Amino acid sequence: MLPPVRCFTCGRPLGHLWPRFRELVASGKTPGEALDELGVDRYCCRRTLFTSVTYIEHAAKYRVGIHVPPERLKMWG
């Protein structure tokens, strides 16, 4: 998932805050403290940043693909 560019509810631009938000959380701050430091005070914007997860780090652990048994391949000739 791409980081949010705008708040899903009010439309406030948030994309420029995403890298700093991740840095602050990685440095040990809670997401709430990081959002306070960034000046994100609307609860809709806080929710948009807080619940946005980049799933690529999790998905990269798994093998992606579809296994089709050989007998099924014969059906498609």
UniProtKB/Swiss-Prot annotation:
Q: Tell me the domain of life.
A: Archaea
Give the location in the cell.
Cytoplasm
Q: Which keywords does UniProt give here?
A: Cytoplasm, DNA-directed RNA polymerase, Metal-binding, Nucleotidyltransferase, Transcription, Transferase, Zinc
Q: Does the keyword Metal-binding apply?
A: yes
> GO terms for CC?
cytoplasm; DNA-directed RNA polymerase complex
What are the BP-aspect GO terms? DNA-templated transcription
Q: Name one Pfam family in it.
A: RNA_pol_N
Show the catalytic activity: RNA(n) + a ribonucleoside 5'-triphosphate = RNA(n+1) + diphosphate
What does the UniProt function comment say about this protein?
DNA-dependent RNA polymerase (RNAP) catalyzes the transcription of DNA into RNA using the four ribonucleoside triphosphates as substrates.
Q: What is this protein called?
A: DNA-directed RNA polymerase subunit Rpo10
Q: Which organism is it from?
A: Aeropyrum pernix (strain ATCC 700893 / DSM 11879 / JCM 9820 / NBRC 100138 / K1)
What are the leading ranks of the lineage? Archaea, Thermoproteota, Thermoprotei, Desulfurococcales, Desulfurococcaceae
